[in-house]
């Protein structure tokens, strides 16, 4: 009986977390998406963070969020071991923000 209750609780948690992500994907609150992208990145859920950040990089262009969004997008692909895409985004970061906060790190990861 305890196993059944435990399994039901786990399924509820799993389904609610999937619903939360889909809700965030459809949201037009870009600051909320940004906070969730960082949350997923910090939790090493790089696929989810990359999906959100890919949209946000374009939307945030020219804003205070743009620089970190682009860097986190590159790191998200790196975390997924998609080194070619990560390298392209690190290079984009470096050329867009040559004096940015993450320039040295990006430069070191361009040719991974």
Predicted regions and their residues:
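Short solvent-exposed coil/turn linkers within tandem alpha-helical repeat scaffolds
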Residues: 24-25, 59-66, 94-104
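Conserved small/polar residues in nucleotide/adenosyl-binding loops
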Residues: 110-112
């Amino acid at each position: 009986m305890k196993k059944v209750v435990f399994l039901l609780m786990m399924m509820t948690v799993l389904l609610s977390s999937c619903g939360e992500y889909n809700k965030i994907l459809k949201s037009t609150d870009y600051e909320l998406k940004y906070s969730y992208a960082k949350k997923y990145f910090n939790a090493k859920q790089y696929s989810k963070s990359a999906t959100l950040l890919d949209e946000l990089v374009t939307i945030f262009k020219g804003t205070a969020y743009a620089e970190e969004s682009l860097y986190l997008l590159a790191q998200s692909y790196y975390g997924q071991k998609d080194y070619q895409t990560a390298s392209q985004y690190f290079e984009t970061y470096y050329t867009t923000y040559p004096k940015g906060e993450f320039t040295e790190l990006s430069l070191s990861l361009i040719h991974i």
